[in-house]
Amino acid sequence: MNAHKLTHLKQLESESIHIFREVVSEFERPVMLYSIGKDSAVMLHLAMKAFYPGKPPFPLMHVDTTWKFRDMIAFRDRRAQELGLDLIIHVNEEGVRQGINPFVHGSKKHTDIMKTEGLKQALDKYRFDAAFGGARRDEEKSRAKERVYSFRDRHHRWDPKNQRPELWNLYNGKINKGESIRVFPLSNWTELDVWQYIYLEDIPIVPLYFAAERPVVERDGMLIMVDDERMPLLPGEVPMRKKVRFRTLGCYPLTGAIESDAATLPEIIQEMLLTRTSERQGRLIDHDQAGSMEEKKKEGYF
């Protein structure tokens, strides 16, 4: 096709599909890290297109911290069943036995043990050598400098000072035994691109992205939704019902909502056109310390 006749979304779609096919042709045991959010929804849709009329030749994998929103878990199970895809759910059982949770142990320790260590356990257990993720360069500064093929050593660590050049659409996938890569087909997409594509392709997403009245408490400058009975309320804290939605989704105690009236996709897109803040501002794990995301990625985080 002539690139000059493609819309920018079709160009992004074509690039992402090319990346999926390249990885499947080069690696023995790929997997898609399915975190249930909007980026995962788009990534899954692109994977279905890339291998149509067949199904993607790799499973989905969700590293479950046990603290995701209930709506996310219900959506995950329903979507995998609808599409007839293999879904691997991995939980760091040692972390569960230790009672690790974000309220008692804080966001950093919770993320390190239940997400990062859980992910490394799963990759080792199933011997995956390539893992697709939905990260985008516009999300956060450490992700802005990460390549589409992000190489990890045998301990799953990332070295930002030792990345391979990527010229045009040429990717070097050679790895040594025990090494692996993380692959980001949405690297060049923006948050607005994602929402426009969801609208144009009619992609199902978790209802939490749409504004609705929900029980929240204001804590550390963020609106935290009271999603289940495990959330301890501080002295004098009373949940309020506010019309909110989420720009990003993670563990519910670590994810801030925003007040919004955007209850449809066109309204969300209009909101995105006017916003001047990053979606990651609603993720407490990004505020642990300066450069916290880069440090997490060096240790094996998504």
Curated annotation (Swiss-Prot):
Keyword ATP-binding: yes
Quaternary state and interactors: Heterodimer composed of CysD, the smaller subunit, and CysN.
Any one GO molecular-function label of the UniProt entry: sulfate adenylyltransferase (ATP) activity
Catalytic reaction annotation: sulfate + ATP + H(+) = adenosine 5'-phosphosulfate + diphosphate
Enzyme Commission number(s): 2.7.7.4
Keywords assigned by UniProt, alphabetized: ATP-binding, Nucleotide-binding, Nucleotidyltransferase, Transferase
EC class name: transferase
Protein name: Sulfate adenylyltransferase subunit 2
Annotated Pfam families: PAPS_reduct (PF01507)
UniProt function note: With CysN forms the ATP sulfurylase (ATPS) that catalyzes the adenylation of sulfate producing adenosine 5'-phosphosulfate (APS) and diphosphate, the first enzymatic step in sulfur assimilation pathway. APS synthesis involves the formation of a high-energy phosphoric-sulfuric acid anhydride bond driven by GTP hydrolysis by CysN coupled to ATP hydrolysis by CysD.
Domain of life: Bacteria
The protein's annotated pathway: Sulfur metabolism; hydrogen sulfide biosynthesis; sulfite from sulfate: step 1/3
Entry's Gene Ontology BP terms: hydrogen sulfide biosynthetic process; sulfate assimilation
Protein family according to the UniProt entry: Belongs to the PAPS reductase family. CysD subfamily.
Keyword hit for Cytoplasm: no
